[in-house]
Amino acid sequence: LVCSEMCIRDSYTAICKRLSADENLKTACSEYPGIRILKQDEWETLCSFIISQNNNIPRIKGIIGRLCENFGDKLPGGGYSFPSAEKLASLESDDLAPLRAGFRNKYIIDAARKVAGGEVNLSALRNASDNEVRESLLKIKGVGAKVAECTLLFGFGRVDAFPIDVWVRRVVGELYPNGLPECMDGVRLSLIHI
């Protein structure tokens, strides 16, 4: 479980060797050794990234905490589980008011209903292509390119996914005004319009 959750089996040495062909990426590999991409539950990842839209980290943590406290199950030893899509699908948007998630409430409910109802079958998508997963996720209200890419990467463990937000776009544009280095070939970057 720990191996799959923390991508420990990925060849970090091989990845760093490939990326070290570029000075910026070589510096990143040497300054942040051993950094890993956390693989999380698909539903929890999808819902968390819907909540993250136009939000800051303390607020995101608060909303997710309230979501778990209000709709999750109490865990032995303290804390609450992340509520299932099925549990949230039975609710209305107004039921999520205690979360203080604003416009995201209706997106959470739509995602829960589509997942619980099987329109977006997260289990089946584990064996689907990246594009099939992406297309399915984009059926959910409030899920755009960034949320879909984040879910692909952190929920489905698809390491070719490349979530782009304003900060990533800005850094990539500053460091690579003429495009990415060859060592990044194969990384899906069609979302970057520098």
Describe the function of each predicted region.
Residues 2-192:
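HhH-family (HhH-GPD) DNA N-glycosylase catalytic core used in base-excision repair
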